Amino acid sequence: MTERVVLAYSGGLDTSVAIPYLAEQTGAEVIAVAVDVGQGGEDLDAIRQRALDCGAVESEVVDARDEFAAEYCLPAVRANSLYMDRYPLVSALSRPLIVKHLVAAARTHGGTIVSHGCTGKGNDQVRFEAGLGALAPDLRIVAPARDFAWTRDKAIAFAEEKGLPIDVTAKSPYSIDQNLWGRAVETGFLEDIWNPPIEDLYAYTADPAEPRDADEVVITFDAGNPVAIDGETVTPYQAIVELNRRAGAQGVGRLDMVEDRLVGIKSREVYEAPGAIALIAAHQELEAVTVERDLARFKRGVDQRWGELVYDGLWFSPLRAALDAFVNDAQQHVSGDVRLTLHGGRATVTGRRSEASLYDFGLATYDTGDTFDQSLAKGFVQLWGLPSKMSAARDARLGGAQS
C-alpha cells in the first residue's frame, strides 16, 4: 500500500514545491492540509485548489479560527502571556493547533508521515515536532527545507522545471507569518538591527504618529475571558477581530525587538498585535483590582513560565497543563469592565470596575471617610521589620555589619 504524507500547506512557493518533491523523495501520496487561523490574505479555496494542481491527492482547508481564538488565544490572555515581557506569542500559539489538525488528517487519510516547511534555524521546527511527538509519536517527520537543504533558488528552479502553477518571480524581502493574534516580520534589511523599520512593513496597524481622534473602548471580562465590547456580547473570535480593527487603527501593538530564540541565537523581529496587546493590558488591570496580593505576585511568575513553555514548543507538556489549571483557578474573580483609550500607539487604561473588586475606597482614601485604623500600623511595622533588626544587631555584635 502506498504511504501517505500529510503536509502543513500554506499555498506559498516552499510548500507548493514540497508536494511533488515529497512525492519524488518518499514515493508517498501527499495530503495537503491548510489550517485557517485567521491569517487572511488569499482565498483558502484557491489555496486548496493550488495544492491539487501541484499534485496533492487530497487537499483540506480547516476553518480553525474560532477554535484558535477560544482555546489558544484566550489562555494566553488569562496568563498575560508576553515572552520577554513584550512578545504575545503570535506564531507560537498557532503551531500546536496546526499540529492537532495535521494529526487528525493523518488519522483520517491513513498518513504515516507528516511534513512541514520549517528551516533548521527557527523555533517552529521544534514546535511542530515536539507537538507531533506528544500527539502521534508513531508518525515520521520530513522537513524538506531542513532535511534536503532546500533553498529558495532551488525551489524556484524546481517549480519551473515541473511547471507548477505558482508565481515564482515576485520575492518579498521579508519572511512574514500572520494570524488572528498578530503578524510577525523578519529577515531582509531588518537583520541589521540598527536599521529602523519602514512603514511598508506594517499591515495590521496604522502609523501611530498620524494625527487622529482617540478611541475609547470598554472591555467586559468574565472569569478572565472577554465577553463584551462596549456592552455588546462578543465571541472570543469577534473580540479579537474588533480589537485588531480598533486598536490597529490607532497604531497599537507595534513591537520591534531582538528576542532569544529557542535554538540559541538572537533574532530581530517586528510584530504587530493590536488586539492582543489591548486585551492583555485590560486583563492585567482587572487582575490588579480583583486578585489578592500574594496570589497576584505568584501568578506573575507562573505567567512568565507559561509563556516560555509555549514559545519553546511545549504546549502539550504536563507542566503547561498544570500551569493552566492554576491560572484558570486564579481567574474565578477576574470579572468586570476595563476602559481603554486607544491613541498614538498606546492602549491606556482609564477606568476599571468590578463587583469582585478588592479595592476599598474607605481603606484607600486619605480624605473624609477614611476607615483605615492607623493606630494598628505602628505595631505592624515593628513586627514586620523585626527579623532584619535582629539580624543587623547580630552582625554588628560580631563585627560583620551588612552594607
Swiss-Prot record:
The membrane spanning regions, by residue number, are: none
Its top-level enzyme class, in one word, is: ligase
What superkingdom does the record give? Bacteria
Under the heading Pfam families, the entry gives: Arginosuc_syn_C, Arginosuc_synth
Q: Which amino acid positions bind L-citrulline, per UniProt? A: Y87, N123, R127, S175, E259, Y271
* Pathway where this protein functions: Amino-acid biosynthesis; L-arginine biosynthesis; L-arginine from L-ornithine and carbamoyl phosphate: step 2/3
Provide the Gene Ontology terms for cellular component. Answer: cytoplasm
GO MF, one term, reads: ATP binding
User: Which residues are noted in the entry as ATP-binding?
Assistant: A8, Y9, S10, G11, G12, L13, D14, T15, S16, G117
Question: Where does the record place it?
Answer: Cytoplasm
Binding positions (L-aspartate)? T119, N123, D124
Which of UniProt's keywords are assigned here? Amino-acid biosynthesis, Arginine biosynthesis, ATP-binding, Cytoplasm, Ligase, Nucleotide-binding
The EC number(s) given in the record are 6.3.4.5
GO terms for biological process, alphabetical:
argininosuccinate metabolic process; L-arginine biosynthetic process; urea cycle
* Catalytic reaction list: L-citrulline + L-aspartate + ATP = 2-(N(omega)-L-arginino)succinate + AMP + diphosphate + H(+)
Family stated for the protein in its record: Belongs to the argininosuccinate synthase family. Type 1 subfamily.
Complex and partners: Homotetramer.
Protein name, per record: Argininosuccinate synthase
- Which organism encodes this protein? Salinispora arenicola (strain CNS-205)
